[in-house]
Amino acid sequence: MLQFITIPNLMDYRVTLKLMEDYVNKVISDNEPEIVYLVEHSEVYTAGTNYKQEELLNYGDIPVIYTGRGGKFTFHGPGQRVIYPILNLASPNRHKDLKLYIKMLEEWIINSLNYFGIKTYIIKDKVGIWVKVRKGEFAKIAAIGVRVRKWVTYHGVAINISTDLSKFSGIIPCGLENSLVTSLNQLGIHIEMSEFDKIIQTEFNKIFK
C-alpha cells in the first residue's frame, strides 16, 4: 500500500518543490517506493508552463514562483489541501499513459467529494474539478497540474477546504477569465483537515491500487 506523508506545518512552496524533485530522482535512480505528500502551503502564487504574464493581476506581498508543472497560475495557501503523488507509471501495476493518469486523479477527487454529497463536473477544455453554484455557473473546487520525469509523476492536486478565496483575485486562475472558485466551507461543509485526509487516502487507494 502507498505511504502517505502528512507534513504538519505550513510549507514554503520552494522547499516542497525541492523535496519532490529529490524524491523523484530517488525513485528513478534507486527505485525508491511510491509515496504521496499531503501539504498545506504558506501563501504563494505558482505559474505552470503555459502561463501568460498578463494573467498575474495584483499579487501584493504574496510570492510568485514559476514551476515546471502543467497549467497556468493558481494560488496555494492555508486551508487548502495539496496532494503530491510521486508514482512510477513505468512500474508493472501502472500504465505509461499521462492522460489516463490525469483521468484517474479526476476520478479520485470526484469520489472523495461525492462522500459529502457534492455533485462535481469535468468541463471540456477547463482542467480541474467543478461544482455548479448557480444556474449555468460553475466554480472550481480542485485544481490539477502535473509533471512527469521518466514516467515518475510529481506536482499534483489542490483542493480548497477552508481557503481564503479572495486571494484568487490576484490572478486569472488557470487562465480562465471570470471563472469562479469555491471551497468545502463555502459549500457549507466544515471539516478538519485530518478528517478530510482520511477520506482522500481511502479513495486514493481504491483508484491507485
From Swiss-Prot:
It catalyses: octanoyl-[ACP] + L-lysyl-[protein] = N(6)-octanoyl-L-lysyl-[protein] + holo-[ACP] + H(+). It is an enzyme of class 2 (transferase). One of its GO terms (cellular component) is cytoplasm. This is Octanoyltransferase. The record marks K140 as: Lowers pKa of active site Cys. In the reaction, the free carboxyl group of octanoic acid is attached via an amide linkage to the epsilon-amino group of a specific lysine residue of lipoyl domains of lipoate-dependent enzymes. The keyword Amino-acid biosynthesis does not apply. Catalyzes the transfer of endogenously produced octanoic acid from octanoyl-acyl-carrier-protein onto the lipoyl domains of lipoate-dependent enzymes. Lipoyl-ACP can also act as a substrate although octanoyl-ACP is likely to be the physiological substrate. PROSITE patterns: BPL_LPL_CATALYTIC (PS51733), LIPB (PS01313). The lineage of its organism: Bacteria, Pseudomonadati, Pseudomonadota, Alphaproteobacteria, Rickettsiales. Signal peptide: none annotated. GO terms for molecular function: lipoyl(octanoyl) transferase activity. It is found in: Cytoplasm. Substrate binds at R69, G70, G71, K72, F73, T74, F75, H76, A143, I144, G145, G156, V157, A158. Its main location: cytoplasm.
